[in-house]
Amino acid sequence: MEEALEMARAKDTKERMAAVERLHQLLEASRKSLSPAEVTSLVDSCLDLLKDSNFRVSQGALQALASAAVLAGEHLKLHLNALVPAVVERLGDSKQPVRDAARRLLTTLMEVSSPTIIVERAGSYAWMHKSWRVREEFARTVTSAIGLFASTELPLQRVILAPILQMLNDPNQAVREAAILCIEEMYMQGGSQFREELQRHHLPSYMVKDINARLERIEPQLRSTDGRSAHHVVNEVKASSVNPKKSSPRAKAPTRENSLFGGDADITEKPIEPIKVYSEKELIREFEKIAATLVPEKDWSMRISAMRRVEGLVAGGATDYSCFRGLLKQLVGPLSTQLADRRSTIVKQACHLLCLLSKELLGDFEACAETFIPVLFKLVVITVLVIAESADNCIKTMLRNCKAARVLPRIAESAKHDRNAILRARCCEYALLTLEHWPDAPEIQRSVDLYEDLIRCCVADAMSEVRATARMCYRMFAKTWPDRSRRLFSSFDPVIQRLINEEDGGIHRRHASPSVRERHSQPSFSQTSAPSNLPGYGTSAIVAMDRSSNLSSGGSLSSGLLLSQSKDVNKGSERSLESVLQSSKQKVSAIESMLRGLHISDRQNPAALRSSSLDLGVDPPSSRDPPFHAVAPASNSHTSSAAAESTHSINKGSNRNGGLGLSDIITQIQASKDSGRSSYRGNLLSESHPTFSSLTAKRGSERNERSSLEESNDAREVRRFMAGHFDRQQMDTAYRDLTFRESNASHVPNFQRPLLRKNVGGRMSAGRRRSFDDSQLQIGDISNFVDGPASLNEALNDGLNSSSDWCARVAAFNFLQTLLQQGPKGAQEVIQSFEKVMKLFLRHLDDPHHKVAQAALSTLADLIPSCRKPFESYMERVLPHVFSRLIDPKEVVRQPCSSTLEIVSKTYSVDSLLPALLRSLDEQRSPKAKLAVIEFAINSFNRYAGNPEISGNSGILKLWLAKLTPLTRDKNTKLKEASITCIISVYNHYDSAGLLNYILSLSVEEQNSLRRALKQYTPRIEVDLLNYMQSKKEKQRIKSYDPSDAIGTSSEEGYAGASKKNIFLGRYSGGSIDSDSGRKWSSSQEPTMITGGVGQNVSSGTQEKLYQNVRTGISSASDLLNPKDSDYTFASAGQNSISRTSPNGSSENIEILDDLSPPHLEKNGLNLTSVDSLEGRHENEVSRELDLGHYMLTSIKVNTTPESGPSIPQILHMINGSDGSPSSSKKSGLQQLIEASVANEESVWTKYFNQILTVVLEVLDDEDFSIKELALSLISEMLKSQKDAMEDSVEIVIEKLLHVSKDTVPKVSTEAEQCLTTVLSQYDPFRCLSVIVPLLVTEDEKTLVACINCLTKLVGRLSQEELMDQLSSFLPAVFEAFGSQSADVRKTVVFCLVDIYIMLGKAFLPYLEGLNSTQVRLVTIYANRISQARNGAPIDADT
């Protein structure tokens, strides 16, 4: 590339043309990322070439930049300010190829950066450009951008709309036409919402008329919805009934939803048009074309179209061809190439396609998944968030839908030993996901050793997220292999054992799965206590018969379904319901006795079931054949009452036998819900519980016309029926008979519901079902509703069972909701099992099936008002899951989510919500989700009814503000605006003083940045902040300042300032000295005893109480006195008095102590007095000043001895600068303290050490580097002269010095490093380690390098035994730092490990197993060299 850039500088035009062509070829062929230096060199050269007189050179430079943008990544963003204007100028070039290349480059920049940002930057030059051609081409560019990015970049249209509307008035016709085309594209993407947006701009009527005329001619591309129109589906069903041959793949219509992620992804895709193929040859040709397109040489938009074409083929029914799976293997290579592409759009589309294929093919996709997952590992760790999230979601979706057991060793190896912490964390999640979804698979059962090694290694990982996931994996391991888990647990470190035991009682962010199976329980089943997960048993009549027999030998009955009579085809014999029941009574007892003998684990064993059911003449469902067939749902237009009527006949029998009928549940829901919500619930129920009572018999002749082909293809036909409404009166009888026979075969033997669900959920072949397809409801699922749980405990067990299907989970939530609607009695039952109830919510709020999530959120909305108090303790763990569903692609999930949050907002105050909001904001990765959390917080703060002047929950509030502050600088405009609005809302409604104190506690840079951001929205906070700072200074001036009783507060409230709630006298009580460290410490200095000379009129009790109150910092003067001591006088030298003060604090007469002052009276802005006539030395006296009707206690400084210079308190006051003292005063004060440190008078340093250290550490944040340099000189001197006193505060000194060592001024940073060296070499090494070790996990490179350097120095001071004891505390973090991308960090780690190696010798080698071979070799080589240089012999020779 360097040669090509050199050629591009040639004078000859042909050479330049050849150079740009060569450059373009090199960049297109390259797969290696460009370095920052290469990007800079390339951009600089191309910017010159863009202005070249030859248009082909300009065109080539633009093409080269477009190729480089994909390889440059983040490095290109530094050059956008120079690059974008130059590209905009090329939009006005006289040659069309140059203009096209410029448009393509802008589109590419939008792809690799942010479309909104690029449009804003380019628009500032292009919208009002003097060249009409630039304006026209830019309008066409943004039009194509809307088509590409509108679905993923929501703010884009708003940024474009206003300037595009202005272009409609452009004098040039071509520009106006380009603008109207852009408006048409926005309408196609936005639909009716775009019209509403247009109305806000108040356009002239003639313009509105013209726009509407253009828009009426186009049809907006509507987003995918649940199902299709009723008319279309009815026609389809009728056509299918007339001609059974239509069930071929050619005629198969796609009933699948277009949003195929099922709630897993955060994107909305354009609907895919089904592509039908009519032969295998045609399908083969399609695949060949697609494979030829998916090569790097093809344009990226063509490759995206090819992948979308595969989706269209799948939607058109291509998966039903037997050759599809073989053809798919041809795409493995091309799709892997697309995954390796640098464009996020291509990667995202490829991941989307893989998710779709895995959901379609299920187990048949397993071989492909095992190939793709290792490729996706490389993407999970990439810095581009869109790519990383798409890859992560893709892997998880594939693991949910197919076992991919052969890739499990690779997952485990990466989780244990990969250098990248993110990949280790993700691989731990993948291993846990596999164990959760496939615990019974033989391949997983054989992987027990692999899981054991994985958990043992990962629970000790350096990254907390890996450790937490490994502990969750252990809990799943314990439930899957209980015997092995005990041995594994005993091998853990005691700390890990304690963590696991503590966490077992709670639910975590990802939450552990429930028990897969109870291996040792032996329940006895009886007719009176049979659980409802045995369909039909104890709740409905049981009819056992052979599946193959016809009605003449045995009636067909599904569980819970009672028919008045059934006739066979030949009308030869008729058997009423009564005769059928009578004939089955003899078999009931046999079934009961058989069930009592079954072990619970046998219920999940198909072989055991088969053997037990053979005696009854029943053929149980195999794992290959679907046990149930889907039936069409009731019309969505029916209300819940209609559903109740239609299901009445279903539930009569079950109610008679003691079961809970569906009609009862519906009635209860109707009774407690309003009409609107009842209708909503009814629609849901009618979807979920298809009715049988409306199925009517047809003539026998029609039955005879049905062919066996329709029976064999029944499952496929039924899926098509499920898309919407259907004419139930025209339902054919052959279908009904087949349904009865199949349902009879399914329900009679399947008393064991876990097997039933297992067959439905994951053991069928891919050709017979679709995973997570909500439009395919099967009869087995219906029975799960009809035979719903009979008790809360049973509902919770069903919902928490990891092998349960989505219907069982919905049924569990429906039962819980019904219980809550029964009033206090039902709520009390829920509260008794509240922990288990919350486990159910935490498990399924993130469920990928939208109906489960919808049911969970709706039930949660009912639970919160009923269980307000117990839910509050779970709120912090639940709300993050709720907020994550607020951006779900499906409206049916978002709507109940919004309702739930509204109820939470009304039920709890912001004080209770703040911890949950803090955690929610911390856990959301998507900007949209973060925005939702902040907007919710704004509403909560605005509703706060308290007084904003009174401090709220200050600790949590500071953490919340600390989370918001970085977001005020976020590149996402909406997120930035919401963060600033939230901070303003805190100030206006919640805690104004807390916010002001927080701003003052920030560093100078952060403080200025935040204040600038707030000033743009409201000047009020800035004004109040200045007044607040000024009032604090004035208060400090009025107050006395006593050297022995200096008042100190945290740096947030200013030196020597009074706290809001109390005043501390004589005891330093410092808060956070440094906003980074947050460490609190206080001196042990006590106030000086008030001794004699206080007047005779003060009673001894009052005097004693006065002294006690001074010690404890009581601020109210009236508290100093008992009511009986309200009359008192302080007399001193016969002329000073304080007259009567009433107990409530009001004053009748106040006379300030006023003596004839001697010449040594010190004022300095304070009330000082010296009384020579008093007997004894008076260190303190009390003075009261009237301040706004309240008395404030102040200290009175008594100067008893003459001094030649200023006292220590004066110096501290001068350095602190609270009186506005200039820099020269601060320097003078620091110089005097240095001299005092050298003199080292014990009396001075004993009394004032803490106050001096406080001021010195605070002044290290001064903007003037010379002051910081002087302060560091003082610290250096104190470290030498006041060593004993400094030893007690060494932790906070080290933290502050580490912070200052990063200063940009070399003199300051060098001085700080010298101070650190002194501390580390002379002070207690273990106290130093206690500060350094926790900081080794920091992400800041400079801090990390400094900490590792400190660690290296400390290592040399420890003995071998001490060092061996400490290794476990810091080695994991050091090894983690070894994998850093920074060369400085890696180099520092090497020297640290080398020093340890030299000290410990071969004993250190076992600890190096955490490193890879290259790293170990590097450490040993350096260690031998350094040891040779120091000792004359390498380590290997010594040991």
UniProtKB/Swiss-Prot annotation:
Subcellular location: Cytoplasm, Cytoskeleton; Cytoplasm, Cytoskeleton, Spindle; Cytoplasm, Cytoskeleton, Phragmoplast; Cytoplasm, Cell cortex
Cysteine pairings via disulfide bonds: none
Region annotated Disordered, chain positions: 238-264, 503-539, 611-660, 672-715, 1074-1101
HEAT repeat segments: 1-32, 36-74, 77-115, 154-192, 281-319, 325-363, 366-401, 402-439, 486-525, 809-830, 831-869, 872-910, 912-950, 954-992, 994-1031, 1201-1239, 1246-1284, 1287-1325, 1327-1360, 1364-1402, 1405-1439
Keyword terms of this UniProt record: Acetylation, Cell cycle, Cell division, Cytoplasm, Cytoskeleton, Microtubule, Mitosis, Repeat
Biased composition (Low complexity): 632-649
One term of GO molecular function: microtubule plus-end binding
List of residues that carry N-acetylmethionine: M1
Family matches, as Pfam families: CEP104-like_TOG (PF21040), CLASP_N (PF12348)
SUPFAM superfamilies xref list: ARM repeat (SSF48371)
Identification of the protein by name: CLIP-associated protein
